[in-house]
Amino acid sequence: CVACHTADGGVPNAGGRPMATPFGIVYSTNLTPDPATGIGGWSFSAFQRAMREGVSRDGHHLYPAFPYTAFTQAGDDDLQALYAHLLAQPAVAHAVPETRLAFPYNIRPLMGLWNALYHQPGPVAPVAEQSALWNRGATLVNGLGHCTACHTPRDARGGELARSAYLGGALVDGWEAPPLGALNRSPVPWTEDAMVQYLRSGHHAHHGIAGGPMAPVVQALAQADEADVR
């Protein structure tokens, strides 16, 4: 959460970070428990609806710069843990700038049509033919990890090309988010241990250094359980 919800030089998770999109600049929200400017007045049900359906507490649609299309796959236990952690932070009174997109993207009710095209709310059922480890990995990659948000290309409406180019690579802030899996063009094949080392340390002798938008991802994964990263 910190990577997107912290402005340069700001308090962690107090929001206000500008995120450039093809449709305008979106400002991240205050995730601290301040009741006036943050989520201090949010019930778990409201938090869960935002994470799974992309709808704020007051009923307005959120923009998919907040990757609820991925977070919808998170399990109930993970969402409960996130909610508890966020509300245990120090409350910071910080009103963030209002997001103002150009017409027609500023008409939030149109997000209902976008969601009908690109959003399938709710957790995905485990694949019975796969192991528990594989299913946990799929939940993390496609859900809370939201790897597809950067590593899957998007169409002109900002929707992920998940069916035709899932994890097929994309450009993010001028950086290449390379294809993952079988489509990766690395001259040295990735091994499981190499991937774990890279994701937790940001470096591997055969695969270079994680820079650009990937750097804060590594900073977060360095604190994650190795079992989840693996």
Named regions from a protein language model:
Residues A20-R49, T69-L79, A165-H204, P216-V229:
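Electron-transfer interface patches adjacent to heme c in soluble/periplasmic c-type cytochromes
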Residues H5, R52-V55, L87-P90, V141, ...:
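Protein kinase-like catalytic domain
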Residues L62-Y68, N106, P213-M214:
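Short, conserved phosphate-binding/catalytic loop or strand-edge motifs used
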Residues G10, M19, G41-A46, S56-Y63, ...:
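Extended intrinsically disordered, low-complexity coil regions enriched in Ser, Thr, Gly, Ala
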Residues R57-H60, A88-P97, A128-W134, D155-E160, ...:
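Inter-heme linker and motif-flanking segments adjacent to c-type heme-binding CXXCH motifs
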Residues L113-N142, N184:
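Electrostatic cytochrome c docking/interface patches
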Residues C1-D8, F47, L82, L86, ...:
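The canonical Cys-X-X-Cys-His
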Residues H94-G112:
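Extended, well-folded interaction surfaces typified by the phenylalanyl-tRNA synthetase beta subunit core
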